[in-house]
């Protein structure tokens, strides 16, 4: 998701997105630990998405 799309969301939607991404990250990490993860780039994508959401939440907290 692009940063501008994230900035258009409200705080509740961003928190829901963050919880969703953290759950997805957990699933991917478990798959990687058991050797079932085929597309390892997904871990990086999810980690960056989490960082983007947290950044936008911090920006909104400062407003």
UniProtKB/Swiss-Prot annotation:
Disulfide-bonded cysteines: none
Gene Ontology annotations of biological process type: translation
Ranges annotated as spanning the membrane: none
Keyword Ribosomal protein part of the UniProt annotation: yes
Gene Ontology cellular component annotations, sorted alphabetically: cytosolic large ribosomal subunit
PANTHER family: 60S RIBOSOMAL PROTEIN L35/50S RIBOSOMAL PROTEIN L29 (PTHR10916), LARGE RIBOSOMAL SUBUNIT PROTEIN UL29C (PTHR10916:SF0)
Family: Belongs to the universal ribosomal protein uL29 family.
Entry protein name: Large ribosomal subunit protein uL29
Source species: Actinobacillus pleuropneumoniae serotype 5b (strain L20)
Gene that produces this protein: rpmC
